[in-house]
Amino acid sequence: MPESPFLLLPPELRLQIYSYVLDIPTPYTTLTQHSKPLIVINDTGNKYTTRAIYRSLHISPNWVGISKSEGPNERSKTLSLLSVNRQIHAEVEHFLYTSHTLFFLNGFDLDHLGEFLDTLSATARSCIRSIGFEVYLFVHNTPGPVKRGFRQYERAARVVREKLPNLRGVVFYFDPWFLACCGDAGFGPWCDERSVLATGVRYLLKVFGGIEPRDKDNDKLRARVEMDLHFLPSSATFKVPGLEQGHAKSLVKVS
């Protein structure tokens, strides 16, 4: 079988073409102050697919935008591109996971994070450098939005350190609609949201920036990996101690 003319193009040009094809707009594309494009992941309450087509392509149909087709009888451009041949699949897979941030909406059940990551290939997981979470930190009595507990974030931090060996950054986006409600006090001047926000940020700093990774073979501690943590929008966290414009690095000393 003759080699595809596309593969005769210089690698730099092929990567540029991949970047155009994979430029998939989502409602979160313009997430302020975050430089990487997003792969937005939601949880509709269904178990993740084990269908061979998705398992072989290492793409979950729950990814907002990725599985969206141009019409009812058309496959998405991403899935079509991944299925051309092995070399293109390998190049696209590497480009997709190294250049994008996996961004989990608040509706995603963090208790299923490990299950979701297991739907990806080992190669894909090793390529992931950045993940993100939409955070409704102070939703307590509001009906509708899911309230995540701190312990879920702690478990999630351990899962990503275990399953994503090359992870180097985590971004937290605090939805501005949910920055004014804390505890049972509700809304009003009596609600010290800055204090509660600082508590939440410090906890996330601790669990995502201060975990000792372990070697899976001998359970010994591996060298600590420096982690970039970003809290957006930075205007919401500018008074939190230890953050510089919503950013913290190498948070091993956070108590």
From Swiss-Prot:
InterPro entries named among the record's database cross-references: AN11006-like, DUF7730
Stored Pfam families: DUF7730
Matching PANTHER family: F-BOX DOMAIN-CONTAINING PROTEIN (PTHR42085:SF2)
Name of the protein: Uncharacterized protein AN11006
Organism: Emericella nidulans (strain FGSC A4 / ATCC 38163 / CBS 112.46 / NRRL 194 / M139)
